[in-house]
Amino acid sequence: MKFSSANKILFSGLVASANAYDLLKDYAGDLKIGVAANAMRFSNSNYVNAMKAFNMMVAENDCKLSGIQQQKGVYNFNGCDNHYNKAKELGMEFRGHCLIWHSYQPSWFQNADANTLKNAIVDHITKTLQHYEGKIKVWDVVNEAIDDNSNGNGWNMRRSFLYNKVPNFVDLAFQTARKVSPNTKLFYNDYNAEGVYAKAESIYNFVSDLKKRNIPIDGVGLQYHVGAKEQPSYNKINDLIGRYCKLGLEVHITELDVKLQGDQNGQSQAFSNALKACLANSCCKAFLVWGVGDNDSWLGANEQALLFNGSYQPKPVYNTLLNILKTSARPASSSAKTLPGNSKSKTLPGVNSKTLPGNKSKTLPGASKTLPGNKSKTLPGGNSNTLPGNKSKTLPGGNSKTLPGNKSRTLPGGNSKTLPGGKSRTLPGGNSKTLPGGKSKTLPGGNSKTLPGGKSKTLPGGNSKTLPGGSSKTLPGGKSKTLPGGNSKTLPGGSSKTLPGGKSKTLPGGSSKTLPGGKSKTLPGGNSKTLPGGNSKTLPGGSSKTLPGGKSKTLPGGNSKTLPGGSSKTLPGGKSKTLPGGNSKTLPGGNSKTLPGGKSKTLPGGNSKTLPGGSSKTLPGGKSKTLPGGSSKTLPGGKSKTLPGGNSKTLPGGNSKTLPGGSSKTLPGGKSKTLPGGSSKTLPGGKSKTLPGGNSKTLPGGKSKTLPGGNSKTLPGGKSKTLPGGNSKTLPGGKSKTLPGGNSKTLPGGSSKTLPGGKSKTLPGGNSKTLPGGKSKTLPGGNTKTLPGGACKPTTVTVTQKVTVTVTVESQPTQGGMNQGGGNCAAKWGQCGGNGFNGPTCCQNGSRCQFVNEWYSQCL
């Protein structure tokens, strides 16, 4: 039965009256709006009717390993198949949940030895994905692998039997799934991921790391179990989803429920914020609630956490979500929605089309708005606004606005505005504005503005007012011809402004400004600025500024005021020749300024002040040579050599050598050598060597060596060595060594602060604090505090798998319960019991351990 083109559900009781409601799926647009189902309730017609409001289904339990393989090697897909078949019967897409999880597992799986467990993970993923190949498009591959006590600084892995026996089980699971089913979307799914707790940031860090290491992950599932009085703000969840989008990941809200907690407005706000944030981010493709009616919720009926009541009738919060979808849903990718009246609308994927009565609108991807009596056809990416009586055709990327009586045709990327009586045709990427009586033709990428009686022809190119790629402004009687190129006012790529009597010819990519009587020829190139009496030779991409008597030589690379890619401004009598390059006022792409009597020659390159990638400023008597990527500033009498990417500043009498990416500042008498990425500051008498990525600051008499990514600060007499990713702070007499890893003050992933005489070594993920004289070692994710005199012996653990991983550590952290509310108790929503569970059985303050089933108890 249909009402106003939308499906409605009728509930009939013992009385004649009936309640009808619109279905969420009919207004969801391109969003999958789903529900978790339990096959045991499929015989209840009211339950099934309520499910018809959704267009996606996920099974609560029957598609988990425990529902498919209760006995080792014996696969029974009947339960999962029942859910899948019901979804197909109701026209719903089916979402797979979940392949690997530490909880709710049969004893044979949980108690297996490391090698058996590894093989079982591979076998289960392989056989399950093969069974549903071409049927289930999305699977949660790994569920809830991050520890509840993760504080947002890096992440801590949950110390489950999976991690303890197969530490790389997450990588193994995703790699196996991709190999078996290349076209299936692979998700990581977790709770407390929506931003209420710090764990959400740790989950983001963990997923980001998977992406950086090229682990084949396609999306992240935010479970979103919250309460009316404990929920993320809209800005928080919107920002979080947006950051996942920037990682190139798809986002699903997978298990949404909101405990009422006596606050109906708060519950409505939590549901609303989640849906609005999902709709606001194009990568958020699915929005699922965890259960149909309140009686079905794993939280219990008293929490009233779902969209339907115990009789499977929609609650007010259902209508709240429905109204949001009706007003804010993104358009469906392959369907069209037509408003009542005489309108016709055909919309291709990704297109927004709004047509008022009496109009016709056909829109390819893009946006089209047509007022009564008008016709508008917009190809992909184009925006068209047409007033009555006009016709407008816009190809992809073009914007066209036409006033009465005019005609405007815009090809892709072009913008065209035509006043009465004027004609304007713009090819792709060009912008054209024509006043009455003027004619303007713009080729792609160009911008053209012509005053009455003037003529302007623009060839293809960069950003230009006259010709494509170039910018040209011509006064009456002036002529301007521009060739294709970079950023220019006159010719493509170049910029030229010519006053009467002046001549200016600019080749592509350069910018030239010439005063009357002056001549300027600019070849494409860099940036050059030379003061009188100075000699400057700049190679491509470099920048050089030389005061009288100074010399500067720049190799190819970064930003340069002198060589190609620069700009040249020449006063009468001055000459400037610039070879091809980057952005420039004089030569294409470069910037060059030459005062009378000065000469400047610039070779092709990028944008640099001294040499490619480097910056050099030299006062009289100083010499400076900079290799690409580095920046060097030398005062009189000082010498400075910088390799690519390094920053070096040397005061008189100091020597400084900086490799790419490093920064070095040396005071008189000090020596400093910095490798790429590191930063080093050395006071008199101190020595500092920094490898790539590290930051090192050393006071007099101290020594500091920092490997990539590490930060080290050493006071006099202290020594500090930091490997990549770690942060180390050592007071006088202390020693600190940091291995690579996560976020840590001492070693990557760990945090270490050492007072004088103390030693601390931390492996990734661990947190360690050591007082003077004490020794402490921490494995990833563990927390340990050692008082003076304590020590641990190093232990070597070797795990042999498809790839052999060897980890050397100094101690093994412990995990276990503490008194009620303690830091090692399970966090809210965490597991606190169940058959075979060996984790903490107490809950942190504000929650209690509640029995869910024989396999699972949770802190609520």
From Swiss-Prot:
Cystine pairs: 278-284
CBM1 domain span: 824-860
Glycosylation site positions: 295, 309, 359, 374, 390, 406, 845
Gene Ontology, cellular component aspect: extracellular region
Domain named GH10: residues: 21-324
Annotated stretches, region: Disordered: 330-793
GO process terms (BP): xylan catabolic process
Bias kind Polar residues: ranges: 330-362, 371-418, 461-474, 485-498, 525-546, 557-570, 581-594, 605-618, 645-666, 741-754
Top-rank EC class of the record's enzyme: hydrolase
InterPro entries linked: CBD_sf, Cellulose-bd_dom_fun, GH10, GH10_AS, GH10_dom, Glycoside_hydrolase_SF
Signal peptide region: 1-20
Record-annotated active site: 144 (proton donor), 255 (nucleophile)
E.C. no: 3.2.1.8
Catalytic activity: Endohydrolysis of (1->4)-beta-D-xylosidic linkages in xylans
Protein name: Endo-1,4-beta-xylanase B
Organism: Neocallimastix patriciarum
